[in-house]
Amino acid sequence: MNFDTFHNIIAGQHRSARETSSGVNPLDRSSLWPAPVATANDVEEAVRSAQEAFPAWSQKTYKQRTELLEKFADLYLAHANEFCQLIATECGRTAGNAAIEVYFAAQWLRYPSKYEISQEITEDDKKTSIVTQEPLGVVAAICPWNFPLMLALGKIAPALATGNCVILKPSPFTPYSSLKLVELAQQVFPPSVLQVLHGHDDLGPMLVKHSRIQKITFTGSTATGKQILRDAAETMKRVTLETAGNNASIILPDVNIKAVIPQLAGGLWFNAGQVCIATRRMYIHQDIFEEVVAQLAEASKDLTSSIEPIQNEMQLVRLKQALADANAAGYELLSLGKTEAAEGFFIRPTIIKNPPPDAHAVQQENFGPIVSCIKFSSLDEAIFLANNSDTGLAASVWSGDISAAKRVAAKLEAGNVYINGPPQPDPYVPFGGQKQSGLGVEYGLPGLLSFCQTKSTYVYK
């Protein structure tokens, strides 16, 4: 299999198209390979093929399906070097950071095999009740550009394990790794069980509105998530949404500053801040505020001296506008790292120092290497400020007292709270957002069950 020509995969076959589009290398803005743009006819054929494959696939046992996922994991890792090169190119990453995603993502192919989905039986004098979990049918997985492999596999694996057929739609900014992933999968799975369609912005709505697709699983912006909810309501589709998180960290005064600063800095700037659970708002106790900000800036110098680019120009423009607005408002900006490279989608990592808590720069999610550092004087104030957002994907608490940190964590309105460590997903732990950061959960047993529908059978004696 070569890694420099790209096709949609429908019914187990390569599909080209009259129209193609090309991604852009974020490092130098050069055009990448042409990829076929799916049409409405392609969508219809993919859905029809998935429906035809569904009966046989869903009738396999859970163990049979997870064994195939394990086999695919081995095959995928055998091509890890090629996927690392693809991720590095389409995302603008260093080879090392591309490898982090490629190898980390393999966990999602293996995690379903650690679970069993069994029926529940209850009995009384009159009847036996049998509760089973059945697959939904055809699932469309709509994925973003920041971690194209990991987030795709996090949707594909549980959907396939539970007996569904999947149509993957990658971001038009980063189609290449997904197209090759599904092409490779044809060596393991029956035709039409896993397909992939690359296209323009009209492709997602075609899938969401399709009457024969039973579920949408989506990661992306809150605005798009809301539109998916509206469109999916017409056919009452199941939806799982993971959307924006303007995530807060609380740094308590008893923290070991020297010990936590490297973790704070690493969490802020990894992947140029293009991480859905990265901190955007950092609330620091007033007694240690200046020291933490100074040490954070110092520790960030090495990390940001060769920071990677923003993945696409659209996001770069948004971030530059956010910094221009913050500067115009008179906020103190600490620009870190080297001067921005003119040829790529680069922006200097920036700390916005103590802006007003209600400032636009604080209340909006800046999806990139920008963090607002804000003073607080009391624990109640910190909790209020952290919760004063319409999003709630992730939060973190940093303290020398674990019991105190747990009490704070219990009061935070976020789906994922991390204590004394940077945010990182785990395939065995449910992951989802509160408020406008999502709907439903992924990963763990609840994530598997989100791709099922419950059937209760009553057998009277």
Swiss-Prot record:
Record's catalysed reaction(s): an aldehyde + NAD(+) + H2O = a carboxylate + NADH + 2 H(+)
Pfam family, one: Aldedh
Active site as annotated: 242, 276
One GO MF term: aldehyde dehydrogenase (NAD+) activity
Enzyme Commission number(s): 1.2.1.3
CDD domains: ALDH_AldA-AAD23400
Keyword Oxidoreductase: yes
List of residues binding NAD(+): 220-225
Presence of keyword NAD: yes
InterPro entries: Ald_DH/histidinol_DH, Ald_DH_C, Ald_DH_N, Aldehyde_DH_dom, LUC3-like
Family indicated by similarity: Belongs to the aldehyde dehydrogenase family.
Task performed by this protein: Putative aldehyde dehydrogenase; part of the gene cluster that mediates the biosynthesis of the mycotoxin fusarin C. Within the cluster, FUS1, FUS2, FUS8 and FUS9 are sufficient for fusarin production. The other FUS cluster members are not essential for fusarin C biosynthesis.
PANTHER family given in the database record: ALDEHYDE DEHYDROGENASE-RELATED (PTHR11699)
Protein name per Swiss-Prot or TrEMBL: Putative aldehyde dehydrogenase FUS7
Organism: Gibberella moniliformis (strain M3125 / FGSC 7600) (Maize ear and stalk rot fungus)
Name of the encoding gene: FUS7
